[in-house]
């Protein structure tokens, strides 16, 4: 079983088009007696998948073979006791992938010619990369992070702290109280300039946000030494020396959410500017055709909503269907995947936040 770790790996799944693909989403419990419900829920959803496969006229032997990896997983008690908030499974005749989510999923089983990926896009599209620089005069640590995980980067060629010959307690006190400040600040600035030069080896050509973690009086000095253009003005304030990687990551999340919110607000602003110019639409049929031709720059789709239908790629016609129709797919999912594959941006919002309050909206490139 392969684990989906990134948006690129998700898009690899999007290329799968092998006749029958099973996509399964479910909430999971992390601890306690409730973890037993994970297996029960999974068993019920696999039964749902069996029924949908029967509607597609698969032979019983084909259904058993396709679902056999899921049946084996069903009986793995250790696996189900080691979950996060949500679980997703993707099965086809030649692939078996899973994803443990930090966010919960609604129960959903989709059997179609493509994998149903919109619930996962909601998480992956917001899983931006960022760096945390934990700074003190005694130690420097650098972490590369996403919303879901973090790892410390071993630093070479970077001073780990000011000279041991200095009385750092006295040095920090003078910095904090601004006594003897010019000479003291000059020493700290020189130290941070060395740190900045060393970081260039790790951050060169990167465009990801850098979050400073350290006491407030050090940040203005570090900012003066810094040459990395994506250093945030907001910081994790306080001495980071006693904080673990997980603790620093947790403190960074409100700052990361603010970055994501700004990007989402910019996208909504772009939609408002484009409305009425022919470069924006809330019409499902128009958007599906635009997604097929790679015209969408920004797409908004509603979380937890499906629009079932069939899009004929040869003639561009769209036929809406019932959810249980074996030939149908979620057209919102189709639009999201096509937009990502063509280099556009997808925002999966709560339905009330999609422009116009509908299930879908888009800004066109042309």
Where are these regions (language model features)?
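Terminal alpha-helical anchor/extension segments at protein ends
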Residues: 1-366
